[in-house]
Regions:
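Cofactor-binding loop segments of dinucleotide-utilizing enzymes, especially the Rossmann-like FAD-
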Residues: 28, 124, 177
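Rossmann-like dinucleotide-binding cores of NAD(P)H-dependent redox enzymes
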Residues: 8-58
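C-terminal, flexible cofactor-proximal segment of oxidoreductases
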Residues: 146-187
Length: 187
C-alpha cells in the first residue's frame, strides 16, 4: 500500500505544480496487500481519479534510465522510478550470529535478543515469533517505553517488563491531497 500512497502524493503534488503526470504502480501480487477489501476499493478509486494506472501480478526484472522491464509484459516508460517494498530484512543481520527468523532478529517478550540478556532489538529489524505483527512503525513506538524500562532494568539488575503488542492498530492511508482513509479492525 506504501507504493500507492507515494504515487498518489506525487500525482497530487505534480498536478498542483501544473504538471499532468503519467504514473504507474507496479504490484508483484494479484492485488494491493496489507489492507481490507473496503480500503483497497477506496484506494483504487482514488488512484483512478488521479489517473494512476496499477499493474498487478507484474515482476520488474530490470530498471533502465528510461523504462522498467517487466517479466512477460511490455516495458513501462519511466522518467523516475520509486521503490516501496515494505519491511525487508536488513542484509547485515544475516552476517551476524544473532538468532534470526526470516532474516529478522528474534526477540522475546521483554524485547531482549533470544539467548543474550545484554542485547535488545525492536522495530523493523526484529521479530517476536510468539506475537507476529506486520512491519509498522506503530509497534516500535509502542515498544519504546518497555524498551526504556528494560534497558534500565538490565543495567540495575531489576526484573524486566513484558511487552504485549496490540493486535489491532489504526492505519491512516493518504489518498494524495489532503484526504486519507482510516482503517482499524479491517474496516
Amino acid at each position: 500500500v506504501a507504493g500507492c500512497e507515494l504515487a498518489m502524493a506525487m500525482a497530487f503534488a505534480l498536478r498542483a505544480a501544473g504538471v499532468k503526470p503519467r504514473i504507474t504502480v507496479i504490484e508483484l501480487g494479484p492485488e494491493i496487500s496489507g489492507v481490507s477489501r473496503q480500503a483497497r476499493h477506496r484506494i483504487l478509486l482514488a488512484m483512478d481519479g488521479l489517473g494512476i494506472v496499477i499493474k498487478t501480478s507484474a515482476r520488474v526484472i530490470e530498471v533502465r534510465a528510461d523504462q522498467l522491464l517487466l517479466d512477460g509484459d511490455s516495458p513501462v516508460a519511466a522518467n523516475l522510478c520509486v521503490g516501496a517494498a515494505g519491511g525487508l530484512a536488513h542484509t547485515w543481520i544475516a552476517k551476524t550470529d544473532l538468532p534470526q527468523r526470516d532474516g529478522f532478529i528474534e526477540i522475546g517478550a521483554d524485547l531482549g535478543v533470544v539467548g543474550d540478556k545484554a542485547l535488545f532489538a525492536v522495530g523493523d529489524c526484529a521479530v517476536m515469533p510468539h506475537a507476529l505483527r506486520p512491519k509498522a512503525g506503530v509497534f516500535a513506538v509502542r515498544a519504546a517505553p518497555i524498551l526504556h524500562y528494560n534497558l534500565r532494568a538490565a543495567l540495575s539488575g531489576n526484573e524486566r517488563k513484558t511487552w504485549r503488542p496490540q493486535k489491532h492498530y489504526l492505519k491512516l492511508i493518504s489518498l494524495g491531497g489532503q484526504s486519507a482513509i482510516a482503517e482499524k479492525f479491517g474496516f
